[in-house]
A protein has these predicted regions:
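Alpha/beta-hydrolase superfamily serine-hydrolase fold, recognizing
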Residues: 1-135
């Protein structure tokens, strides 16, 4: 199971949501800095699909996925597209879109309903993957 919480999978940030540059937690500037450190160089250069999953051409051999992302997250568009591509490749993928949630908002506001929904979906996906979910 790919259990992905607002994953950072595209080093190019070429989407509309990838242009978010005014959020104090995670924005385009902090993300480019993270990619630069991770890729040991320029964040905008082509990256291996092993480093940036969005660069992969063939997703058909990947395991099932559970992806959670908020509508106010820098990674929203790339995560939704990754889920679409997984499904198109025949890989079971559940996409949980969380209205109003920004990147790591669940960490800052764990009691918020949207945060609790995120954690409930994660717990259920993990329980199902391990075969211990209540019927």
């Amino acid at each position: 199971l790919q259990l992905l919480l607002y994953p950072m999978i595209d080093n190019l940030h070429a989407t509309e949501s990838g242009q978010i540059d005014n959020h104090p937690v995670w924005n385009q500037a902090t993300s480019f800095a993270a990619w630069e450190m991770y890729l040991n160089g320029e964040p905008g250069k082509d990256a291996s699909c092993y480093a940036a999953a969005a660069r992969a051409d063939d997703l058909s051999l990947l395991p099932p996925a559970h992806i959670c992302v908020g509508t106010e997250d820098l990674f929203y568009d790339e995560d939704v597209d990754y889920a679409r591509r997984l499904n198109a490749a025949g890989v079971p993928c559940e996409l949980v879109v969380l209205p109003g949630l920004y990147h790591a908002g669940d960490v800052f506001h764990p009691q918020a309903r949207v945060s609790q929904r995120l954690m409930a979906s994660v717990k259920l996906a993990l329980a199902q993957a391990l075969g211990v979910a209540d019927s």
